[in-house]
């Protein structure tokens, strides 16, 4: 989103605090701060954008929590990328299109799968430590809807935390990137010509600032906290989507919300702890209250069917009063603490030992597939 540095309506004539029209409101700002690019959000998308631009522009990253922020650090499962011997971007793309059930933009899927290996190599160069085998080669696991093992993990089930750590450290080292933590972006500011020329931000001390910039990047994550059952952290409340809508941006596919099939069914937990798909990739089975597998009757890939298929099958059973469990005793067993240390700790905190107990699971809101409509270069309608 961008328009140049022209002032918004009303800003130039203000005496004392400057009056700025943003979204559907008028704000009295205490300061005007200039940057070449403002990036709203400090998860993997926001931090990567800042690093890509930071060598050639003055970038200001704003996050309402700390660095890194959002769902990135909570992501257990890994990165799907066609880098394993015998794999290819074309095969990865075919699996992706199949899982999308006719809804994917195949041109964008092609970009995603072709650029994936290069982006992973960039993460490694920036310090991300992915799991490797005894010979030092990258270790790939298998997860749902993938025809082969192509998922990279870090520390077993702490992939997002490791990627976030590496990117945050790189951002802090970058001389032309500034970060405002614990600052809340209220609204986008539009110039008289109609484009976006910055954002109004509430700083930690409560004062308001107009971040004036010719380009604003929204990397604010999803809407998971709109749902009672979600795996998302508290800050994922759809702020970026809402401010884009107030500014008049085109939105798309808002109805597509992915529910992860296997969150820990812990009524006292908020958010619900995620039981990564990687556990099923290791061979764990979904079973009903009688200990019988049911996904083998639902889909040829059984537990590794696309997430919507698995989540729907579980939800149907829960709706009629049944319980569903993820049984990893045979597939992982005593190796659980080493293979999935984060999940093991979460389960134990709720009185479940996955080495000897089946894990009660339930679907939970996980990922917003829709959002602000953009083109192949990430440009919105504003």
Residue map of PLM features:
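Glycine-rich FAD pyrophosphate-binding loop
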Residues: 54-76, 85
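Extreme N-terminal leader/targeting segments of oxidoreductases
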Residues: 1-37, 55-56
